[in-house]
Regions:
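RecB-family 4Fe-4S metal-dependent nuclease core
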Residues: 1-361
Length: 361
């Protein structure tokens, strides 16, 4: 195999990068290391200094800007059910997302938002009515005309047909009643290690034939958890803990008017350590965005009083979020996405080549 040399640096900035790499590489001969250090010193002290030449501009050797925790030690940590899995999988992913440093929302996510909004405001409509509303609002997405836009419109129509089928079968086959949409809750989950303020909204709140509340989460993405993941699915489990505290009845009681929407400022409910106030009826994901023709319903069975793992997931998430450092966790395969999930933040992740500091390369 023929070896190819990298092109010579053409600018002072490029040369500075080359010199810094030589200075930090463990296999650089001492004479070359000294020469690189002298040149970098000249670049840094020149009348017009070269950016990046001075050591104080090398992020890899600077001290941490702060080691203060994100939350006051006496305050409960606000935990969203949808973020629990992320912070357990990789605290760094969670932190970067909370800092709003991830990519902006794309058109396909806007499509999912539109489907959610139509389902929220027309929860009992049939497929014809839902699709008519979709086509009326379609131009607001700014989808490109042509084949791509037509494909996305067809996909959105399929999702709404699935939703209409789910809503119909919920009433007729499963004998559940819809009592609230986009209900909000705040549950203070007490724990000796760290209190968590479980805060979120639910797409649909239903009541089963036994009078128990059931949380329904509509999913418009293409990917879904496996059947083996559902019994301990973190987001569904967190919803059930909220129901154990009585959040279901609180959301139902806050409904104002026939549109089934509740208050935007739910009252805080406290769930004391080791107690269950209300028995939930379970929680489920309704998959609308996958490739199947029918809605895929993935249901987590009701939690009983002896299942403390769900509460521990929440309080352990609070501990991770309240830390001063956020660990990057993933396998090497994630960097290239060979197992279906790539690193979400490769530009800052020390486990990825792109995110390593110059002192680590």
């Amino acid at each position: 195999v023929e070896e190819l040399d990298a092109p010579e640096p053409l600018t002072l900035r490029q040369l500075t990068g080359t010199l810094r790499r030589a200075l930090n590489a463990v296999d650089t001969p001492e004479t070359e290391r000294e020469a690189a250090a002298r040149l970098l010193h000249e670049f840094a002290t020149a009348q017009d200094p070269v950016a990046g030449a001075a050591p104080e501009q090398w992020w890899g050797v600077n001290p941490l800007t702060t080691e203060e925790a994100l939350f006051d030690a006496e305050e409960p940590v606000r935990v969203s059910p949808s973020k629990i899995e992320t912070v357990h999988r990789s605290p760094l992913d969670w932190f970067v997302g909370e800092a709003r440093a991830t990519e902006t929302t794309d058109l396909k996510r806007g499509l999912g938002t539109l489907v959610h909004d139509i389902a929220e405001h027309m929860p009992d409509a049939d497929a014809v009515e839902l699709i008519a509303e979709l086509r009326r609002r379609w131009p607001s997405l700014g989808m490109p005309e042509g084949w791509t836009g037509a494909q996305e419109l067809e996909r959105a129509e399929t999702m709404l047909r699935k939703f209409a089928q789910y809503a119909r079968e919920m009433r007729t086959r499963h004998e559940r009643e819809l009592v609230a949409v986009e209900g909000g809750f705040q549950v203070l989950v007490r724990d000796s290690a760290r209190d968590a303020l479980l805060t979120g909204r639910v797409d649909r709140l239903e009541v089963d034939a036994h009078g128990r509340h059931v949380v329904v989460d509509l999913k418009t993405g293409r990917h879904k958890p496996t059947g083996a993941d559902i019994p301990e699915h973190p987001q569904l489990a967190a919803y059930q803990v909220a129901l154990q505290a009585g959040a279901g009845q609180a959301m139902q009681d806050s409904v104002q008017g026939e549109d089934l929407h509740g208050t935007d400022r739910p009252e805080r409910i406290e769930l004391p350590e080791g107690t269950v106030l209300t028995q939930p009826g379970g929680a489920l994901l309704v998959q609308l965005g996958d490739a199947t023709a029918k809605p895929g319903v993935q249901q987590q069975d009701p939690l009983d009083e002896d299942q403390q793992w769900a509460r521990e997931l929440i309080t352990q998430a609070a501990l991770l979020m309240a830390g001063t450092r956020f660990e990057a966790r993933h396998t090497a395969e994630q960097e290239n996405g060979s197992h279906g999930r790539s690193c979400a933040v490769p530009w800052v992740c020390p486990l990825c080549a792109q995110g390593r500091q110059v002192t680590e390369k």
